[in-house]
Amino acid sequence: MLARNNSLVTEFILAGLTDHPEFQQPLFFLFLVVYIVTMVGNLGLIILFGLNSHLHTPMYYFLFNLSFIDLCYSSVFTPKMLMNFVSKKNIISYVGCMTQLFFFLFFVISECYMLTSMAYDRYVAICNPLLYKVTMSHQVCSMLTFAAYIMGLAGATAHTGCMLRLTFCSANIINHYLCDILPLLQLSCTSTYVNEVVVLIVVGINIMVPSCTILISYVFIVTSILHIKSTQGRSKAFSTCSSHVIALSLFFGSAAFMYIKYSSGSMEQGKVSSVFYTNVVPMLNPLIYSLRNKDVKVALRKALIKIQRRNIF
């Protein structure tokens, strides 16, 4: 528990998304539905990709890992977030908070680079189709995936390590629904200069490098699509490409906006914008990247038919 003045904080209180009592119950059911849809969608795709050998290709390999990341990082904070809507005081221990911070950052940063790998995969498939099998070999895909997780581990370790060196004295109310970097820095009673420099460097790298790489990849992809002679083929490619760009913009845009708003002191706007990359995007990813795909639809239809036949007999 929190002791008196000049003593160290051993637990935090998560303020949650809103302090308006009339919104608590509706928001609980809303985010519960979002979480269930996220879990079912991503877990379903993981099982589908694992059981269907014809989906063991580079594109679906990255989608498998994306679903795994979304499944994990939604589960890192959502249970605590839901508790905040139904309990008067949502308490998390110091150790629990640092653990949540580490795994949240690990999965979020890993997702940034997994999305980058997926954009590169689409670039090679559309712009250099004849070299696709050679360029996107199993070894290359494994290296890109491993690199994504390594970047996630490095970023999470840097931020959490710097956070552990701080001292938290009297203030223990985190103005957020999860343990995140900037809300925690505001509570420290010691200098946060080193942490702020690390945030500037690490967050800058993990947002700018993936977003610029993805942007360049999609510029080349759009250029190639414009050379497609078939109007139907061109419109279909643009439809797929635009949905991907919207999902990516939501993820990177809301993450960048949240850090900008928290840095400028607009905490409430920062919390609301964070909902998009923490809750909305993991729910939409299966629909945008997988369930609109013809091969996935066929595999899903076959799986549902098998389940129906088993139930009949």
Curated annotation (Swiss-Prot):
| Keyword hit for Cell membrane | yes
What's a Pfam family this protein contains? 7tm_4
Q: How does it sit in the membrane?
A: Multi-pass membrane protein
* Alphabetical list of InterPro entries matching this protein: GPCR_Rhodpsn (IPR000276), GPCR_Rhodpsn_7TM (IPR017452), Olfact_rcpt (IPR000725)
Against Gene3D superfamilies, the record matches this protein to: Rhodopsin 7-helix transmembrane proteins
User: Which Cys pairs are S-S linked?
Assistant: 97-189
Q: Which residues lie on this side of the membrane: Cytoplasmic?
A: 47-54, 121-139, 218-237, 292-313
Entry keyword set? Cell membrane, Disulfide bond, G-protein coupled receptor, Glycoprotein, Membrane, Olfaction, Receptor, Sensory transduction, Transducer, Transmembrane, Transmembrane helix
Per the UniProt entry, the glycosylated residues are 5
Which domain of life does the protein's organism represent?
Answer: Eukaryota
Compartment(s): Cell membrane
List GO BP terms, alphabetically.
G protein-coupled receptor signaling pathway; sensory perception of smell
- SUPFAM superfamilies found in the cross-reference section: Family A G protein-coupled receptor-like
The membrane spanning regions, by residue number, are 26-46, 55-75, 100-120, 140-160, 198-217, 238-258, 271-291
Q: What is its main location?
A: membrane
Record topological domains on the Extracellular side: 1-25, 76-99, 161-197, 259-270
Q: Which GO terms describe its molecular function?
A: G protein-coupled receptor activity; odorant binding; olfactory receptor activity
Which family, according to the similarity comment?
A: Belongs to the G-protein coupled receptor 1 family.
Q: What does this protein do?
A: Odorant receptor.
Which PANTHER family does the record match to this protein? Answer: OLFACTORY RECEPTOR (PTHR48018)
What name is this protein filed under? Olfactory receptor 8B3
Q: Which organism is it from?
A: Homo sapiens (Human)
Read off the lineage from the record: Eukaryota, Metazoa, Chordata, Craniata, Vertebrata
Q: Which gene encodes it?
A: OR8B3
